[in-house]
Amino acid sequence: MRTVDVIVAGTGGMGTAAAAHLARRGAGVLALDRFPPGHARGSSHGQTRLIRLAYFEHPDYVPLLRRARGLWRGLEQDTGSRLLVECGLLASGPAAGDVIAGTLRSAAAHALAVERMTAREAMGRWPAFRIPDAWESVFEREAGYLAVEACVRAHAEVAGRRGAVIEADHDVRGWRVEGNGVVVETSRETVSAGRLVLCPGPWAADLVRLPAVPFTVLRKSLFWYAPAAGLAPAAAAALPAFAFDTPRGFWYGFPMLDGRGLKIAEHTGGRVAADPLDVDRAIDPAEQAAVEGWLADHLPGVGRTRTDHAVCLYTMSPDHHFVVGLHPEHPQVALAAGFSGHGFKFASVIGEILADLALDGTTRLPAGFLAPGRFAEHVAGRDP
C-alpha cells in the first residue's frame, strides 16, 4: 500500500489549488481523480468565471476575495500564464434587490471602489445594453474574469513542479480513519496518508459524509452567441462582464473572447442531476429560448447565432454558502464542498486554507463562517 503525507481527493479547481499549496509547503502529495485536471465533467470548465470584490452574497467573503486576487496574480507570475483579466463588471437590477443592495452593502463594509449609476448613465457608457429606467447599476472597475481551465492547469503545474503526484483514472470510492491517519479506497488501489483533503465537487454527497449537510447537484447550461450586425466584434470584445437581476432570474455574461462569441448563462434555476456521471449535455430548447429572450430584452445587438454550448454542475449547500473546514468528527480530514455556483474565484485561497488545515489544524484566514459545523449547531441569527 502506498503511503503519503496528504491525499487530495479531486483535482478540479479546488483540488489542484490545494495540491499546489500543500506541495509548496513541502508535503508529499498524491492527488486523485476520475478525470485529469481541466476536464469538462464537473464545475471547473467553460472558458471563464467572474471575479469581483463587492460581493453581494455576503460581506464576510470580501477578505477572502482580496487574498484570492493576490494569489491569482502570484500564480500568473509563477507560471507565466494570463489568468485574471480586469474587464470590469456591470451589475444591474432593482435597487432593493439582492444583487444591487448586496453589492453596495459589501462595498460600504469594506471601502471598495464602485460606481453607482442610473440606467440611462449605464446605457450611455455601454449602448449595447438595455436596462429598465427603474433599475440601478453598479460598476466595479477592478472586477473581471478568470480563465478557468488555464487556472486549473496552472495550479496542477505548480503542484507537479513541487513534487506532487497527480493521477487520473482513480474513482475514489471511500475513506476511513485508521489511528491518526486515513485510508482511501479507489477503483485501482488502497492508499494511506496522514491527512486527507476532500475536494469532491459534484460527488460531495458520496464522499464528504456530513449527514447534516444535504448537497444537491444542479445541471447548468452555458451558451455562446455571435454578435449581430448591430454590435461590431470590437465593441462586443470591449464590453464589461455583466450581471443582471431580472424578474426572470439572475443572468450573467462576459465580453466576446477569442472570437468564440459572448458567453451568457442563468445563475438561477437548473435541473437536479441525480448522477454526476450521467448528465444530459444536449441543448435544452427551453433553456435556449430563455437565453434568447434575455438577449432580446437586454443585449439586442447579440444575434441568434449560437456558437457554442456547454453544461457544468453546481453543487449546492443548504444555505448556498461554501462548506470549508475540518470534518467535525475527523480532524485528519479537511474538506471543501458545496460551492453553490459561486466558488471558483476563491479556488486560490481555498487551496491555501485547506493546506493550513491539513498541515496545521487551523488557518489564520477568516474562513470560520464557512465551517461545516454551522449546520449541526443550528446557530440562529447568523448569515451565513
Residue map of PLM features:
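C-terminal catalytic lobe of FAD-dependent flavoproteins
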Residues: 291-384
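Active-site substrate-recognition segment that forms the wall
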Residues: 20-24, 80-84, 190, 195, ...
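Dinucleotide-binding Rossmann-like beta1-alpha1 core, especially the glycine-rich loop
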Residues: 48-125, 134-135, 250
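Glycine-rich FAD pyrophosphate-binding loop
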Residues: 23-44
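Beta1/beta-strand and adjacent pyrophosphate-binding region of the FAD-binding site
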Residues: 1-12, 30
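N-terminal Rossmann-fold NAD(P) dinucleotide-binding loop
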Residues: 15-16
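Short beta-strand to alpha-helix junction loop
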Residues: 63, 91-99, 138-157, 279-287
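Helical element adjacent to the flavin cofactor pocket in flavoenzyme catalytic cores
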Residues: 139-195, 199
